[in-house]
Amino acid sequence: MEKNKKMIMQTEENTKISELLKKQIAQSEYPVVGAKFNNEYKNLDYSLEESGKIELIDINSKEGMKIYRRTLTFIMGMAFWRAYPKAHIVVDYQLSNAMYCTIENMEVTEEMMQKVKAKMQEIIDKDMKIEKRTMTRKEAEEFYKKTNTPKGRLQFDLEDNNEINMYYCGNYYNYFYEVVATHTGVTNIFDIQKYGNGFLLRYSSSKNVNILPKFKETKKLLW
């Protein structure tokens, strides 16, 4: 598939992007993690309701790497939930090809990092389905009251959006405002390591998606 090729598509109502462009996605040189439809970024499971311009987004692009990073963060949360279900994780800020995270109620140890990394690799190797479910704010408020869960609550409280996107994988779920990939297997290049009082969730660069770059000390960045 030609890099970043834009296509004008005509489709039947409620056709998923992943179904419409199945061949192009399979033939892509790099894993496809989302799409840009009529200038809006969409999940590959997004159901098209009209014809329009569509561009597949792979991980060899800045926006694709953002989706990669969000998906990896989701998987990291799922791995902690399986290994340390009581851990209160905070994603603090972005460094050079890494997210700096802390745990409010537990000490970060090397043993913990090894265990969580193994859980993450297991989730990635299984290429598990990640499903997006959109709720109204009222439905989301009722959901949080019913489940009494802290997952995604901070971000939820800070947003003013009328619609809330919850992402599910198996029995795990969390809230993300922007696009997350539809499968865990696209995030196969990563590392997690103890750093200061917290830890780093490291990932590749869109400049070279096949290697994990050496970590460099930098000022924190917005993510």
Each model region followed by its residue ranges:
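Short, contiguous acidic and Ser/Thr-rich linear segments
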Residues: 4-16
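Short amphipathic alpha-helical segments
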Residues: 13-17, 68-72, 108-116
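Short alpha-helix capping/helix-loop boundary micro-motifs
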Residues: 38-44
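Auxiliary tRNA-acceptor-end handling modules of aminoacyl-tRNA synthetases
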Residues: 34, 46-65, 79, 88-96, ...
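Active/ligand-binding-proximal structured segments within catalytic/core domains
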Residues: 21-24, 65-83
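Short loop-to-beta-strand transition segments
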Residues: 27-38
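Short amphipathic, charge-patterned alpha-helical segments
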Residues: 13-27
